[in-house]
Amino acid sequence: MSMNSNSVGAMWSKNVTFNNGEILLAGIPASTLAREFGTPTFFLDEDAFRSRAIAWRDGLKSEFGDRAGHVFYASKAFTCTAVAHWISEIGIGMDVATGGELAAALAGGVNPSKIQVHGNNKSLAEIDRAVSIGVNTIVMDSLYEIDRVAEAARKHGKRQAVLIRLTPGIEAHTHESISTAHEDVKFGFSIASGAAWAAVEKIAQLPDLELRGVHCHIGSQIFGTDAFEIAADRLLAFMAKYRDTYGTQLPELDLGGGYGIAYIEGETTVEPEDVLPTLGASVRTACAKYSLDIPAISIEPGRNIVGPTMFTLYEVGTVKDVVIEDGSIRKYISVDGGMSDNARTALYGAEYIAKIAQRTSTAPTAQSRLVGKHCETGDIIIRDIQLPSDVVPGDLIATPATGAYGRSMASNYNHVPRPPVVAVIDGKARVIVRRETEADLLALDVAKM
């Protein structure tokens, strides 16, 4: 699909404006940002981030009232101590999947009672730390893990609250790599195979564990509500079976995240009001169907909060005209970043738009490919895009909607230092994650031949 560089709208955060073709974030021109912070750099609209997190917090409360559980920000999308601090100020929780994500949450001031621990292969050290500090819940993902968490709880003299991650057998129509609730995946316990019920029976025999509820995550970049509705029904049916067997109802239901955002023309970003009323109706219908009280409902938006709030700013280094098989010319526009700061195109075939960031252009557009500086043919940021034919070295190029899985999946391929993250609000910009240096990379080397 060929992207149009003149698109402005759902892909850009709410405080991005345009003046004579130049991008401004909270009133600061892109050229000024580039001079002060260099390129490539992730620029984060802090006001937009806060607003989106608050919207999910308030939306959950509005829909479910006193049955609203937690909004857990999915920190895998992007985290750092500043983001964790904002989350703490806003009053929502964080979901973490590694010791590093837990460390960032704690360093940012998130109360352990608002931290939920995920992951399909938690280490013994990660489990021990989570139990010792009193996290909200640990989401069980294997029978081995149930024993490990119980052992850690005994060691620390605690009764650890846990959820069971269920795979309800749903095909959420998204990329295979980010679809997580069908049967053939590494995550969770299958309802259909009986594995989920075996996990329930195992936990019931361990007094050091408190089974608080069930969880599922059906995938990412989901725009419809059908899959969420089916998931809610299947999980509540499972909870009804638990009640019928054990004589008590599990108090919590976590329906995960996965709410889509706009990356290209024709896409829209899912807002809380687009999904929560339907989700609420589905939960109430299923609870009536199975004669259940409405449990506390939790959700886990990550990409949907941070994704639309960032753009990446690059500088063009070279432009090359290449004659392709059909005889036409494709411009290869090489920038000073690439797959080391945005791996999603290579991993998932993800699509983006891009725009000259510091000037306007009246030149006709040209068939273009935006590529990085790495020694890899697949180092492509945007495979097909119509960009002005007068793009030259020194131009700034911005790609929006890079807040999720950009910096968090960044690498040091070709020994390239990772870019910084700069938060901008009310006309002021500050670094919240500094740019790596070559000295940082070399500092990890501990031996010489």
Where are these regions (language model features)?
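A charged N-terminal "starter" segment
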Residues: M1-A161, W197, Q205-L206, E210, ...
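Active-site loop/helix belt of alpha/beta enzymes
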Residues: S2-M11, G169-K320, L387, N414, ...
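General structural feature for long, well-ordered alpha-helical segments within catalytic domains
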Residues: P29, D45-A48, R52, W56, ...
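Secondary-structure transition/capping motifs at alpha-helix termini
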Residues: E63, N111-S113, H156-K158, L206-L209, ...
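Short beta-strand segments
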Residues: A74, A161-T167, H215-H217, D254-G256, ...
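Active-site-proximal loop/turn and secondary-structure-junction residues that shape catalytic pockets
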Residues: A77-T79, G100, N121-S123, S142-Y144, ...
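Charged (often Lys/Glu-rich) extended helix/loop segments that serve as interaction or gating elements
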Residues: T278, R284, A288, L292-M449
